[in-house]
Amino acid sequence: MAKSPETEHPVKALGWAATDNSGTFSPFNFSRRATGERDVQFRVLYCGVCHSDLHMVKNEWGVTHYPIVPGHEIVGIVTEVGSKVEKVKIGDKVGVGVLVGSCRQCDQCSNDLENYCYKQILTYGAPYLDGTIARGGYSDIMVADEHFIIRWPENFPLDAGAPLLCAGITTYSPLKYFGLDKPGLRVGVNGLGGLGHVAVKFAKAFGTKVTVISTSLSKKEEAMQHLGVDEFVVSTDPQQMQAAVGTLDGIIDTVSAPHPIVPLLSLLKPHGKLIVVGLPDKPLQLPVFPLIQGRRTIAGSGIGGLKETQEMIDFAAKNNIVADVEVIPIDYINTAMDRLLKSDVKYRFVIDVEKSLKPQ
């Protein structure tokens, strides 16, 4: 049997991996490549737990290669840089988000939209250039091309800032691209979870009036008092939904469970935009009449390019925007995944990798 290219990698690493679609994690020894001339190696301090990690470890999208080491909200301290690296130096705080590679030549890459490159390489679970499967941040060491490294602002929290590398850019980018960042606009956020609470924070920082749409009345007090939303609509209450018809310029739909979108479209003004950023594991039904009636738009958005991700992190640092997190040791990850499946987290788990990942 041919050897895996990973066996040639000299950097010994320790992580936690799922080895089958039960999604159960256990310690996992593997190797990373040596630091190339344009690579940055860093010691992982924290890694956020994204809902997509749960989908991937259970192979719900049918693309998972086992064993899988998830994690694409990764922050740490640089320990080694290649000879041609100019972006960061040893000792700097850095982050890596959802991408670690792209072709760097296509129109999308040329326009700083590596996230839409057809040859993009995801931070974990995807084949890398050398034929190995990329391993994510549930591990003690990362090596990445400097182009995909995010510089971390001084005094910006590492633990609460880490989820912004996915949840932050996933919501910041569509707010900017679709023009929903103008003061005075009325923006809806469907779902108040890991993505939704960050979307609220960015939308408020842009000066918009924010309406949270949720199935959970229990989240109203938190949304109004802690997050400062302007309106809260319970989507299962027909009277509340009727009162909100035609009031919103746009909606960021963060829900990752299958859900009807006709009620959301009714909340939009004419020419309003429904932007889907959640990842349900089943198709959503697309109604045509509400689109035609008000020239409304349904669109999608996926993370952001590296330039925009750096812009987002800098904006967040300037405006004191962080995720609300529960910091956990890495040996709690199986329990955390069970809780995530039940939406029992407010609002994002973050693994304290440095303090809790130890050789077994």
Curated annotation (Swiss-Prot):
Residues binding Zn(2+) 2: C103, C106, C109, C117
Pfam families (UniProt xref): ADH_N (PF08240), ADH_zinc_N (PF00107)
Protein name: Geraniol dehydrogenase 1
Organism encoding this protein: Ocimum basilicum
EC category name: oxidoreductase
Keyword Ribosomal protein: no
Gene3D superfamilies: Medium-chain alcohol dehydrogenases, catalytic domain, NAD(P)-binding Rossmann-like Domain
Family as reported in the entry's similarity comment: Belongs to the zinc-containing alcohol dehydrogenase family.
Required cofactor names: Zn(2+)
Catalysis performed (reactions): (2E)-geraniol + NADP(+) = (2E)-geranial + NADPH + H(+)
EC number: 1.1.1.183
Gene Ontology BP term (one): alkaloid metabolic process
